[in-house]
Structures are given as C-alpha cells and as structure tokens.
C-alpha cells in the first residue's frame, strides 16, 4: 500500500510535500513513500 514517488529529498526520514499529500522519505535513494489517508 506504499507508493513510491520521485522527490527532491536528500535526507533519510525527511518530510516531503507532494500534490498527492504529505509524504515522508523512508528510502535512501531519495524516494518518498506517500500515504494519503
């Protein structure tokens, strides 16, 4: 249920703001796992 979206995140665990909603970076490669509730 986790969708990976390309983001400009550099640090691990950094919060991201995407059109889909608030995403939190949980990937080392800089990808974010977006979960919209």
From Swiss-Prot:
It is found in: Secreted. GO terms for cellular component: extracellular region; host cell presynaptic membrane. Keywords: Calcium channel impairing toxin, Ion channel impairing toxin, Neurotoxin, Presynaptic neurotoxin, Secreted, Toxin, Voltage-gated calcium channel impairing toxin. GO terms for molecular function: calcium channel regulator activity; toxin activity. Its main location: secreted. PROSITE patterns: OMEGA_AGA_II_III. The keyword Electron transport does not apply. InterPro entries: Omega-agatoxin_II/III_CS, Toxin_34. Expressed by the venom gland. Disulfide bonds: none annotated. It comes from the Eukaryota. The keyword Secreted applies. Pfam families: Toxin_34 (PF08396). Belongs to the neurotoxin 04 (omega-agtx) family. 03 (type II/III omega-agtx) subfamily. Omega-agatoxins are antagonists of voltage-gated calcium channels (Cav). They block neuromuscular transmission presynaptically. This is U1-ctenitoxin-Asp1a. It comes from Ancylometes sp. (South American fishing spider).
